Amino acid sequence: MKNLYEILEVNENATQEEIKKSYRRLAKKYHPDINSGDSEAENKFKEINGAYEVLGDKEKRKKYDMYGDRMFDQGTGGGFSDFGDIFGDFFGDIFGGFSSRSYSKNPNAPRKGSNIQVELEIDFEDSINGTKKEISYKKKVKCHVCNGDGAKPGTEKRQCEKCHGTGIINDTKRTPFGIFTQQSECDKCHGEGYVIDEKCENCKGKGYEIERKTINITIPKGINNGAIMSVKGEGNDGENNGSPGDLYVIIKIREHEFFKRINNDIVFDMPITYAQAVLGSKIEVPTLDGIEEFELPEGTQPNTTFKLKSKGVPYLNSNSRGDILFTVKIIVPKKINKEQKEKLIKFSESMNQELNVNEKKSIFDRIKDMFE
């Protein structure tokens, strides 16, 4: 039997609060109502509840720490309550009233189809301006030959004689705490509650076939990278006339060669010449809406950042926008001609670029302070 601490993903020194917190997280993750049609998740959910039934109780945990797995094979004592009772005590609030016994499924009840997840890559500009995109994906649909029954037309599926149509096998053991009953999926019908003797040739008894579906979705302005859009009812078809699942589209935004997005602001480096920085100049700044003129002030220093307000990314479902923040980078030419060189020398001499006395003193004082 698997270590109960490992099942709840905690160490043996974990506090009761840590055990409870981990149990809530795992139970929420693997709950059958979230993982509709996923038998592996359902079995994991049962396993988690079984582990918490022991470790969530101080006295039972103490005996488990003492006897380990042997506690399930011997002795008598106080009885176990149904795992679902523990779950129902506090998960109703989290899940809005999920049934505490929903894992004990009725195999003939309608089952919602499972959800589908796809990724959609879009251009940077499309994430800013919004767009419409076509998505093509594969989904499970009801078999058109057997109408989702799984049995060959003209035949019927029959009730499983091992589980009597419940899809569940009860395994009862005596423990130091009394009788312990654990439910598991019937291995004969695989939890379906029925057996198909003559399977539909088209779907091989599965009741569904794979179909490629194409739909159009609208990408809103300002959508974020990694955002998940849900399209209700476009997932896999349900079983026993259950409703279909949903389609979840994960948005992936391609990087832009020039712009970078930080929240709803656009940032980038803007190259300017030495003369533009010194003299000031009207420069053309690229924006999401086209070219914007900007008055660069005289004496602009390298790496100064300027802002174009409300020229950034639109906020979702809002008319407001972020800003554009561009940082000026002074480009130094690698080569200049003779005339340019002579003029630059004259300019340098006229500026007398030697540091004045006050500037020198200020620098020396700061260096001196570093070593005191």
Curated annotation (Swiss-Prot):
Keywords of the record: Chaperone, Cytoplasm, DNA replication, Metal-binding, Repeat, Stress response, Zinc, Zinc-finger
Cofactor(s) listed: Zn(2+)
ZnF CR-type span: 130-212
Protein name, entry field: Chaperone protein DnaJ
UniProt domain comment: The J domain is necessary and sufficient to stimulate DnaK ATPase activity. Zinc center 1 plays an important role in the autonomous, DnaK-independent chaperone activity of DnaJ. Zinc center 2 is essential for interaction with DnaK and for DnaJ activity.
Residues annotated to bind Zn(2+) 2: 160, 163, 186, 189
Location(s) in or outside the cell: Cytoplasm
Keyword flag Zinc: yes
One biological process term in Gene Ontology: chaperone cofactor-dependent protein refolding
GO CC annotations, alphabetized: cytoplasm
CDD domains associated with the record: DnaJ, DnaJ_C, DnaJ_zf
